[in-house]
Swiss-Prot record:
The lineage of its organism: Bacteria, Bacillati, Cyanobacteriota, Cyanophyceae, Synechococcales. This is Ferrochelatase. It catalyses: heme b + 2 H(+) = protoporphyrin IX + Fe(2+). One of its GO terms (cellular component) is cytoplasm. It comes from Synechococcus elongatus (strain ATCC 33912 / PCC 7942 / FACHB-805) (Anacystis nidulans R2). SUPFAM superfamilies: Chelatase, Chlorophyll a-b binding protein.
């Protein structure tokens, strides 16, 4: 079999307040996060957005101690996974590849090559697949592989998503049950799943399976839980004026309060590690919205982190992937495109010289408008609460 490695993929997060700006730049410079018709606009726009959002984001990170715990927790998960595999007699090095902050995926691949790894299991720490999370990391890995003959020699097997696995479902159900049982009337607690949202266009135009997998995942968790509690699925972290998957978490919380719900158990279903979206967005922002709306008891299910059932299930998954590889990197980076975003019969987009001239003018006007808003502190983005 040769030397075995496991590459855990995750988002990454700023560990210090001074890291926030560069982290946001890396995030918004990813074309899978912000899709633009002109690649040359990506980096200038990323610089602009990150410059505008850094101060507000730093305030949020101050609320959770001045930095993200994501790297530390992911390292703990990697250590636990390596030990679990070792206990089974499977020697494997476990690496961490973050998409937008250290240790970057590129750093992990360099170490994997230096260690002489022959077989690599690529395992995203996102239970459900989305083109903006696992998909972005897979595409980065494919680009690195395409231009690196040494990387091409490594036998890579990929796990696109794994939300259906029984160990994961059991671990989630166990954590939910523990929070429900803290209530005076556990059977009355409303289970509230909050998933990270994505723009509707990702699902309807790009064919992203994320919404389907999230909805299927919530049903399977409730089936595994085996209780009759009412439950709701909503989507958080919406950014910008475009339509995202609904219902939005803040709206759903207020609606439940209007319906008389008093006991709420919130489940961060997209995340397996504590980070800014659980510790600040859910624990602080959404808690405040819920309590102001009339919800009296707001309990939040902890992220899986190094839950024994979760780590055991990841170990099972690695062993099964080594025994029966199902997907290559190339298999998970070619997503079908369902419709054209800019139909040619309605609008010339980059086909003729005249179209290119108008496209350039429109893009430049938009960029200048953003710069004016940055300098004046007034404009539609401020009105929408984005800046």
């Amino acid at each position: 079999m040769g030397r075995v490695g496991v590459l855990l993929l995750n988002l990454g997060g700023p560990e210090r307040l001074e890291d926030v700006g560069p982290f946001l730049y890396n995030l918004f410079a990813d074309p899978e996060i912000i899709r633009l018709p002109f690649p040359w606009l990506q980096k200038p726009l990323a610089w602009l957005i990150s410059s505008l959002r850094t101060r507000k984001s730093q305030e949020n990170y101050k609320q959770i101690g001045g930095g993200s715990p994501l790297r530390r927790i992911t390292e703990e998960q990697a250590t636990a996974l390596r030990q679990s595999l070792s206990d089974r007699g499977q020697a494997a090095q476990v690496y961490i590849g973050m998409r937008y902050w250290h240790p970057f995926t590129e750093e992990a691949i360099a170490q994997i090559k230096a260690d002489g790894i022959d077989r690599l299991v690529i395992l995203p720490l996102y239970p459900q697949f989305s083109i903006s999370t696992s998909g972005s990391s897979f595409r980065l890995l494919q680009r690195l592989r395409d231009r690196d003959p040494e990387f091409q020699k490594i036998d890579c097997s990929v796990v696109p998503s794994w939300y259906e696995r029984s160990g994961y479902l059991q671990a989630m159900a166990e954590l939910i049950a523990q929070e429900l049982d803290k209530l005076e009337q556990p059977e009355q607690g409303h289970v509230f799943f909050s998933a990270h949202g994505v723009p509707v266009s990702y699902v309807e135009e790009a064919g992203d399976p994320y919404q389907r997998e999230i909805e299927d995942c919530t049903r399977k968790i409730m089936e595994t839980l085996g209780r009759s509690n009412p439950w709701t699925l909503a989507y958080q972290s919406r950014v910008g004026p475009v339509e995202w998957l609904q219902p939005y978490t803040e709206d759903a919380l207020e609606e439940l309060a209007e319906r008389g719900v008093k006991d709420l158990v919130v489940v961060p279903i997209s995340f397996v590690s504590e980070h800014i979206e659980t510790l600040e967005e859910i624990d602080i922002e959404y808690r405040e919205i819920a309590e102001e709306a009339g919800i009296e008891r707001f309990l939040r299910v902890p992220a899986l982190n190094t839950h024994p059932l979760f780590i055991q299930d990841l170990s099972d998954l690695v062993e099964q992937t080594l025994e029966q590889p199902r997907f290559r990197l190339e298999d998970v980076t070619l997503l079908p495109k369902k419709v054209k975003l800019y139909p040619q019969e309605r609008w010339e987009w980059g086909i003729t010289l005249n179209a290119e001239v108008w496209n350039g003018r429109i893009a430049m006007l938009g960029f200048l408008a953003l710069l004016v808003e940055l300098l004046t502190g007034r404009g539609p983005l401020h009105a929408l609460g984005l800046l």
